[in-house]
From Swiss-Prot:
Keywords: Acetylation, Coiled coil, Isopeptide bond, Methylation, mRNA processing, mRNA splicing, Nucleus, Phosphoprotein, Spliceosome, Ubl conjugation. InterPro entries: DUF382 (IPR007180), PSP_pro-rich (IPR006568), SAP_dom (IPR003034), U2_snRNP_Complex_Component (IPR052584). Residues 305-321 have a biased composition (Basic residues). Pfam families: DUF382, PSP, SAP. The modification Phosphothreonine is found at residues 281, 294, 763. The modification Phosphoserine is found at residues 272, 290, 292, 300, 343, 414, 418-419, 844. Residues 1-10, 260-269, 330-342, 383-397, 405-414, 827-852 have a biased composition (Basic and acidic residues). Residues 24-58 form the SAP domain. Component of the 17S U2 SnRNP complex, a ribonucleoprotein complex that contains small nuclear RNA (snRNA) U2 and a number of specific proteins. Part of the SF3B subcomplex of the 17S U2 SnRNP complex. SF3B associates with the splicing subcomplex SF3A and a 12S RNA unit to form the U2 small nuclear ribonucleoproteins complex (U2 snRNP). Within the SF3B complex, interacts directly with SF3B4. Found in a complex with PRMT9, SF3B2 and SF3B4. Interacts (Arg-491-methylated form) with SMN1 (via Tudor domain). Interacts with RBM7. Interacts with ERCC6. Component of the minor spliceosome. The modification Omega-N-methylarginine is found at residues 205, 228, 230, 491, 498. The modification N6-acetyllysine is found at residue 258. This is Splicing factor 3B subunit 2. Residues 695-715 have a biased composition (Acidic residues). It comes from Mus musculus (Mouse).
Length: 878
C-alpha cells in the first residue's frame, strides 16, 4: 500500500506527500478497483467514476492513497512493507488536542501457514517481522497538533475494526444463503471444529466459515460497505492453536485476519477473471458455471436482473425438492442434491438472457454519452408480469402435494424462503404510494411561473391542480372572476362576524331630507297611545292618508338629490370584513374630512375652508409635495379664500412664497391670472386691404347702391321665403289663421320646428274654451243631447294632416313671379272657398247610419237577456 520513500530522519513523523496532479488518473482499472475494495467503496463503473471516487475519498478524509503493487499470476511480486507512519494504506494523522502522541501499534503475530503474500497487514512468512516503527518525539509539532494526530489515529483504527465487523457479518449471511440455495443439509461438525466463537473487540461472536464456500455474486447499493472477498480458510488446527495460545502478545482479531486473507485470494481470482473476460464475447449458456464467472457477469448486471435470475433458479429447484422429498429418504436426498448440483442442467431448462456488454472507454465525454442511452433503456415491467404468472402456478402445485416433511424441515424451508424474499425485497427500490408519486411529479411554483405566459396570477396552491397550466390560463383570461378566498379557509363562511354587532338599517341621506322618518316616528307614538278599542276600529275601517308629504319634495328627493349606492367593480368579490376597510378611492388629496379636522383642532362647518391647515407654513418654506405636482393648495400655489389675509396671526395664511422680485414661486398665489385682473388691451383696427389698390370712384359706388336697391325689390328666388297670399291656405278645409288678422307680407315656407323648440319662445296654451251650440231636437242619436260644442276651432288648431306636414300649399312656378298684391287677393279667395265648403257639409247621413247600427244591437241583445234571466229563475231554489 505504501510507495517506497527515503527513510525519514529519526525523531520526525513521516507525513504523506501530497499527490501530484493526475495522481489517480495514471492508474490502471485493476489498481483503482483494488484500492477501492480496500477502503470499502463500490468497485463497479467506468474508469472515470473509479478515479472520481478515490479523489472524493482523499478530499473528505485527507488520506493520500499510494499506487498498489498488484501480484501477477506467478505470485512472485510482493507488496513492500508499509511505511512507518502508514498501516494498510492509511496515513497516520497528527495527534488530536489534549492527548499524548499515539504510539504505533505493535507488530501483528505471524499469520498461519498458507496466508497469501499480498496480505497487507501481515508480512511474507519467509521475511520475518518488519522493522520496528521509528517514531520519536516530534520536534516540529506542537502539543496541540500531537493531540489531534492521536485522536485521528484512534478514530481510524475504530473505523477499521467496525468495517471488519460488518464484513464478517455479511460473509456469514452469504454463506447461509448459499447453503439454502443449494438445498443440501450440510452436516454440522462438532462445536470445537465447525464453529469457532471469535469475539472481536467491537462486536459479538462471529462464526467462522468452515469448508469450501462457493462465493455468490452480490450487488450492493452505492455507499454500502463492500464485503471482503473470501478465499480458502486456514486449517482448523492453526485456528485452535492460535486460540489456545494466550501467551502471545496483542493480536489482530482473528475475524479480521480471516477477512483480509479471503480478500487477498479474492483479488487473485478477480485479476485472472478480468483477463479471461476480455477474450469472451458470447453469453454464458449454462447455469452451473463457476462462481468466478457468475460474479464477473453480475458486475455489469443491475439489481433487477440479478433478482430475476435468483427467482428463476428458485422456481426450477422447488419441483426438484418436492419430488425428491416424496420419493427418497433424507440421506438419498442429500446424495441426489449433491449430484444434481455437480451435474449440468439439461439443455431444455437453459434460459438464455442477453446482457449487453459495457465497453471500457476511458474518455471523459463518454460518461455523458452513456447517460443519454441509459434514459432510453427498455423497462422490465412486461417481463415481471410474465414471471409472476408461473410463480402463482408453482405455488398452487406445491400446495396440492402432500407434505411428508417433518416439523423441523418445514420450519427450515420456511425460514429459507422468508430470507430469500427479504433478500429480494431489500435491493429493490421502495414502493411509493400514489400520494407520494403525485408529490414527486408536481411542479414547483417557480417552474410553473416559468412555463406560463402570466406568472403574476400564479398562486401557491395552483401547482396542486389536475392541470396547472390550464388553470393559470383560465385565471389569466380577461373578465374572469376569481374563486372566493374562503374556499380554503378552515372556518365557515361569515362565522367570524359573530361578535360584531349589526347596526339597524339607516335610510339614505336624500330620503332623510324629506322628513318622512320624523313623521313616521310621530305616527307610531300616536298609535302606541291609542286604546285597543280604537285600534280594532281602525282595522275594520282604516283611515288613509295619515302621512301627508309634499309630492314635489318627494320627487326632488329621488330625481334630484338621489345618490348612487356604493357598488363594487366587476370581478371584485366580497370577503369577510370588507366593509370595515378604508376605501382610499373616496379620499382625495387636499379634501379634509370632518374627522381629520376635529383631530387637528380645526373648525367644522360651512366656513371651515377659511382656516388654513397646520402644514401650510412648512409647505410655504419647503415647497409643495412632489407626489402631487398639480394639487392646488390655497396660500401656496393658488389664491386664499375671500375675506382671509396672509400673516402669522390666528387664522392667518402665513407668508406667500415669492422670489427676490416678488414673483410667486410655485403658482398664482395672489390670483392675478383671473379674468377680472387682466387688463383688456383694446385691439387697434387693422386695414386688411392690399396696399397699393386703386380707390373706387364715385360712379362705381353709385352703381353698387342701385344694385343693392334692385336686389331688395326682387322676390326671394331661393325658396326659403313664400309670398303671403299663397302660403297660409290649408288644403284640409280649415283655416289656420283666424279672420281679422293682418296678412303678413312674407311667410317662411319651411317650418323651423327644431330651432323654435330650442329657443322655447312660444309657450303652449293651457286650455281652449269651446263655444256652445243649442239644438231643438235630439234626433235618432243614442246619446243625443241639446247641448253641442263647436269643435271647429280645436280642429283648426291641430294643424294639417300628418301626411301633408311639409308644404301646405303647392304653387305653380309662374305664380311665384306675381306681385305681392296679386298673392294677397289669391289668398283671400281661397279663404272664402273653404268657409263655403264648411257651411255646405252636412253630417246628418252619418248620424242616421250610426243610430241604425245602435238599434240593431239593442234588438239582438233583448231576447238573449230574457232567456238567460228565466233560466236562472228556474234553477234558483231555497
Amino acid at each position: 500500500m505504501a510507495a517506497e520513500h527515503p527513510e525519514p530522519p529519526k525523531g520526525e513523523l513521516q507525513l504523506p506527500p501530497p499527490p501530484p496532479p493526475g495522481h489517480y488518473g495514471a492508474w490502471a482499472a485493476q489498481e483503482l478497483q483494488a484500492r477501492l475494495a480496500e477502503i470499502g467503496a463500490p468497485i463497479q463503473g467506468s474508469r472515470e467514476e473509479l478515479v472520481e471516487r478515490l479523489q472524493t475519498y482523499t478530499r473528505q478524509t485527507g488520506i493520500v492513497l499510494n499506487r498498489p503493487v498488484l501480484r501477477g499470476e506467478d505470485g512472485d511480486k510482493a507488496a513492500p512493507p508499509p511505511m512507518s507512519a502508514q498501516l494498510s494504506g492509511i496515513p497516520m494523522p497528527p495527534p488530536p488536542m489534549g492527548l499524548p502522541p499515539l504510539q504505533p501499534p505493535p507488530p501483528p503475530p505471524p499469520p498461519p501457514p498458507g496466508l497469501g503474500l499480498g496480505f497487507p497487514m501481515a508480512h511474507p512468512p519467509n521475511l520475518g517481522p518488519p522493522p520496528p516503527l521509528r517514531v520519536g518525539e516530534p520536534v516540529a509539532l506542537s502539543e496541540e497538533e500531537r493531540l489531534k494526530l492521536a485522536q485521528q489515529q484512534a478514530a481510524l483504527l475504530m473505523q477499521q475494526e467496525e468495517r471488519a465487523k460488518q464484513a464478517a457479518v455479511l460473509m456469514e449471511q452469504e454463506r447461509q444463503q448459499e447453503i439454502a440455495k443449494m438445498g443440501t443439509a450440510v452436516p454440522r461438525p462438532p462445536q470445537d471444529m465447525g464453529q469457532l466463537g471469535v469475539r472481536t473487540p467491537l462486536g459479538p461472536r462471529v462464526a467462522a466459515p468452515v469448508g469450501p464456500v462457493v462465493p455468490t455474486p452480490t450487488v450492493l447499493p452505492m455507499g454500502a460497505p463492500v464485503p471482503r472477498p473470501r478465499g480458502p480458510p486456514p486449517p482448523p488446527g492453526d485456528e485452535n492453536r492460535e486460540m489456545d495460545d494466550p501467551s502471545v502478545g496483542p493480536k489482530i482479531p482473528q475475524a479480521l485476519e480471516k477477512i483480509l486473507q479471503l480478500k487477498e485470494s479474492r483479488q487473485e481470482e478477480m485479476n485472472s477473471q478480468q483477463e479471461e473476460e476480455e477474450m469472451e464475447t458470447d453469453t454464458r449458456s449454462s447455469l452451473g458455471q463457476s462462481a468466478s464467472e457468475t460474479e464477473e457477469d453480475t458486475v455489469s448486471i443491475s439489481k433487477k436482473e440479478k433478482n430475476r435470475k435468483r427467482r428463476n433458479r428458485k422456481k426450477k429447484k422447488k419441483p426438484q425438492r418436492v419430488r425428491a422429498a416424496s420419493s427418497e429418504s433424507s440421506g438419498d436426498r442429500e446424495k441426489d442434491s449433491g449430484r444434481s448440483r455437480g451435474s449440468d442442467p439439461p439443455a431444455a431448462d437453459v434460459e438464455i438472457e442477453y446482457v449487453t456488454e459495457e465497453p471500457e472507454i476511458y474518455e471523459p465525454n463518454f460518461i455523458f454519452f452513456k447517460r443519454i442511452f441509459e434514459a432510453f433503456k427498455l423497462t422490465d415491467d412486461v417481463k415481471k408480469e410474465k414471471e409472476k404468472e408461473p410463480e402463482k402456478l408453482d405455488k398452487m402445485e406445491s400446495s396440492a402435494v402432500p407434505k411428508k416433511k417433518g416439523f423441523e424441515e418445514e420450519h427450515k424451508d420456511s425460514d429459507d424462503d422468508s430470507s430469500d424474499d427479504e433478500q429480494e425485497k431489500k435491493p429493490e427500490a421502495p414502493k411509493l404510494s400514489k400520494k407520494k408519486l403525485r408529490r414527486m411529479n408536481r411542479f414547483t411554483v417557480a417552474e410553473l411561473k416559468q412555463l406560463v405566459a402570466r406568472p403574476d396570477v400564479v398562486e401557491m396552491h395552483d401547482v396542486t391542480a389536475q392541470d396547472p397550466k390550464l388553470l393559470v390560463h383560465l385565471k389569466a383570461t380577461r373578465n374572469s372572476v376569481p374563486v372566493p378566498r374562503h374556499w380554503c379557509f378552515k372556518r365557515k363562511y361569515l362565522q367570524g362576524k359573530r361578535g360584531i354587532e349589526k347596526p339597524p338599517f339607516e335610510l339614505p341621506d336624500f330620503i332623510k331630507r324629506t322628513g318622512i322618518q320624523e313623521m313616521r316616528e310621530a305616527l307610531q307614538e300616536k298609535e302606541e297611545q291609542k286604546t285597543m278599542k280604537s285600534k280594532m276600529r281602525e282595522k275594520v275601517r282604516p283611515k288613509m292618508g295619515k302621512i301627508d308629504i309634499d309630492y314635489q319634495k318627494l320627487h326632488d328627493a329621488f330625481f334630484k338629490w338621489q345618490t348612487k349606492p356604493k357598488l363594487t367593480i366587476h370581478g371584485d368579490l366580497y370577503y369577510e370584513g370588507k366593509e370595515f376597510e378604508t376605501r382610499l378611492k373616496e379620499k382625495k388629496p387636499g379634501d379634509l374630512s370632518d374627522e381629520l379636522r376635529i383631530s387637528l383642532g380645526m373648525p367644522v362647518g360651512p366656513n371651515a375652508h377659511k382656516v388654513p391647515p397646520p402644514w401650510l407654513i412648512a409647505m410655504q418654506r419647503y415647497g409643495p409635495p412632489p407626489s402631487y405636482p398639480n394639487l392646488k393648495i390655497p396660500g401656496l400655489n393658488s389664491p386664499i379664500p375671500e375675506s382671509c389675509s396672509f400673516g402669522y396671526h390666528a387664522g392667518g395664511w402665513g407668508k406667500p412664497p415669492v422670489d427676490e422680485t416678488g414673483k410667486p414661486l410655485y403658482g398664482d398665489v395672489f390670483g392675478t391670472n383671473a379674468a377680472e385682473f387682466q387688463t383688456k388691451t383694446e385691439e387697434e383696427e387693422i386695414d386688411r386691404t392690399p396696399w397699393g389698390e386703386l380707390e373706387p370712384s364715385d360712379e362705381e359706388s353709385s352703381e353698387e347702391e342701385e344694385e343693392e336697391e334692385s336686389d331688395e325689390d326682387k322676390p326671394d328666388e331661393t325658396g326659403f321665403i313664400t309670398p303671403a297670399d299663397s302660403g297660409l291656405i290649408t288644403p284640409g278645409g280649415f283655416s289656420s289663421v283666424p279672420a281679422g288678422m293682418e296678412t303678413p307680407e312674407l311667410i317662411e315656407l319651411r317650418k323651423k320646428k327644431i330651432e323654435e323648440a330650442m329657443d322655447g319662445s312660444e309657450t303652449p296654451q293651457l286650455f281652449t274654451v269651446l263655444p256652445e251650440k243649442r239644438t231643438a231636437t235630439v234626433g235618432g242619436a243614442m246619446m243625443g243631447s241639446t247641448h253641442i260644442y263647436d269643435m271647429s276651432t280645436v280642429m283648426s288648431r291641430k294643424g294639417p294632416a300628418p301626411e301633408l306636414q311639409g308644404v301646405e300649399v303647392a304653387l305653380a312656378p309662374e305664380e311665384l313671379e306675381l306681385d305681392p298684391m296679386a298673392m294677397t287677393q289669391k289668398y283671400e279667395e281661397h279663404v272664402r272657398e273653404q268657409q263655403a265648403q264648411v257651411e255646405k257639409e252636412d253630417f246628418s247621413d252619418m248620424v242616421a247610419e250610426h243610430a241604425a247600427k245602435q238599434k240593431q244591437k239593442k234588438r239582438k241583445a233583448q231576447p238573449q237577456d230574457s232567456r238567460g234571466g228565466s233560466k236562472k229563475y228556474k234553477e234558483f231554489k231555497f
